[in-house]
Amino acid sequence: SIIDDINNILKVTKISPKKIIIYTAEQWKSKAYNSILKNVLDGQTNIGAIIKSLIANKETEQIKKDPDFVKKTLNDILSEPTELRKGRMKVGEIDEKKIISSELTSLVKNDYNVELDVFSESDVNKYDPKNKARSARPFKPAILIE
């Protein structure tokens, strides 16, 4: 979970947080995730074939700029239990930014006594001094703690 990730970062870095920022993946990555997930559920795990199908689709052709995303996402999906995969397929695309903002803002405030900022990777005015947003993947947001 995101809270576990925050706790692990704090444990490793031993910093006392002043601000926590979470970056969610941009829209095309969510579409690509769902396409990769569908491929896996249909038995297709060949990265080359998956990349080819993503590039052929107008909504996910941006994968050309980040082919490593497919490998990481495929590994994410394959490491998850089958039931979770099926559940995510049923749900389809979600607004991670909205969900994280509504579910974690007060929790972070209570647990760490700091503000939580949530940005989409594609937000033009996002605060991202360490260029973390680009590493965000669906269900695997990037985290910056200052």
Predicted segments with their positions:
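Feature 926 captures the class I aminoacyl-tRNA synthetase adenylation module centered on the KMSKS loop
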Residues: 1-146
